[in-house]
């Protein structure tokens, strides 16, 4: 028993990134050495099954809790922060659509399958969307209807905000925390799941799958870097009328670098608050806007959801029209806010976006598995983009207010 506890302690003390890399390597080696060992595949099946089981509950309780706990005491600066977060999240999803159209990706799934229902156009997509919105909420949870889950979670959260007692809201918040902890436990076992998923793919398709996954990863990271180094600086320039890059690079260096390794916007909140203090921001403002940004500023998540969904559509041969892609951008932006700083949260929202195009939950969860395989890099870059943006937009809102009041901007911005 002591040996088992010691092994578990050593396992938990090892970086998750290192464990995933080891699991990936072990899965590939086992696939080449013993391709007929079916028991290894079961690790991947169990991992994906656990994710499939917890994901609907995760989306519902996190969205409902976030809305129920929402605050209405927001001045002009908070309004600016919310606007910037929502604007850039939508732009991130839209840019991801453009890059996916320019560089379309397909992936090798564990089970070759076709979409159960291939939508013929935007009208059919809209019909599916509206029908799924008002589906029975219990049925939506049981069947993984993420559009219905999101709709009912929003209504439940808004109603709870108005009519719920403080103790009830606390219970909802505690439930969200408990479900998030279950997700962390599952993701803590991701190395074993990744081992099984890689084993299945390599034993069936050879090592060439890593080339395809590499192209998909390159598209994801490239789109995120474009967002971080081009789009966000341009928006900051529009608000501050000065060189945005001193602020951008400082946020990437002091916030993004830490977030890259923690892989959690929520875990990076203390780092961001310390940086806000160094930037001379109002503590009453950033003490609320930074946690708010960790919830709704999800540029990287929107990019991940959009690109992975379109890759699934391309893999299944589904033709996605431009209007349907725009609809996907909106859905990805809204869904990304549900990622809420949960490790791997954006990947768990891929099925919601996939459901727009009639892609079955089984295929969508295979895409989630692919996401975990490349997540060592993807999730780190995504979190760095999101977390650095939290400080960038808090600073932009504050400094924009300074400009309106005739107060000089910090010296480092005027270089």
For the regions a language model picked out, list residue spans one by one:
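Signature of multi-pass transmembrane helix bundles
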Residues: 8-33, 48-51, 76-247, 407-415
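Membrane-water interface of transmembrane alpha-helices in multipass transporters/channels
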Residues: 39-43, 75, 171, 207-215, ...
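Short amphipathic alpha-helical coupling elements at transmembrane boundaries
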Residues: 41, 45-49, 139, 170-185, ...
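Hydrophobic transmembrane alpha-helical segments of multi-pass transport and channel proteins
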Residues: 50, 86-90, 94, 221-225, ...
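Juxtamembrane helix-boundary/capping and inter-helix hinge elements in multi-pass membrane proteins
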Residues: 67-76, 162-166, 205, 241-244, ...
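Membrane-interface alpha-helices at helix entry/exit sites of multi-pass transporters
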Residues: 75-81, 181-188, 278-294, 322-323, ...
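Helix-loop-helix junctions within the multi-pass membrane cores of secondary transporters/permeases
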Residues: 254-336, 408-414
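Transmembrane alpha-helical segments and their short flanking loops
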Residues: 307-415
